[in-house]
Amino acid sequence: QTRAIINAALDVNKKHKNWHLEPEIMIPLVGEKKELDYVANIIRTTADKVIADKKANLKYHIGTMIEIPRAAVVAGELAETAEFFSFGTNDLTQMTFGFSRDDAGKFLGDYYDKHIYESDPFAHVDQNGVGALIKMAANSGRATRKNIHLGVCGEHGGDPASIEFFQRVGLDYVSCSPFRVPLARLAAAQAAIHADAEKKAERKSAKTLKKPSKKILYLIRQNYF
């Protein structure tokens, strides 16, 4: 797979002189840094040999999926090796809740009736549980590697409510099924606008607190001096 990816990128760059592809190779189902290092070393050795044999130059990146809870917990360690994270929210949801999407359909209806769950965790990201893991991993990853690229792949990447949450915790991109792309783009734009409006409101509030109005100062003087 590594040879195929690198060869494809080299061929494209050769045919299109104005293009400069930098392939990203993602390692799935990682939960231990030693495991990530082992696989990443194989990828680098293979990729570098292909590049050297072609007497070419090519920059590539190695990252990992964050799709098991342990990976989210040790994300700071994984970021020492990984240049990017992609949160696989389908598997992360399954492993966090302890049931699969296939099994969920057999009992989630009863859970809704009993008000145990308000919504399908495979349709809308569980912000209190799965979302907390994502936020923790994002913060830990950025603490280790400031410029780490963070994204999401899975059905949640096309859900507007989930996209707004991903925006709030600082993820850079979402990927989803092709038919969800238009909705995802609209939701991402709306989430960015909302986030920008909130920041402006916070800055305005902070300025107001730093500069009390003349009326407030007058009342303070009248009552306390």
Where are these regions (language model features)?
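Short hydrophobic targeting helices and cationic amphipathic motifs
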Residues: 217-219, 224
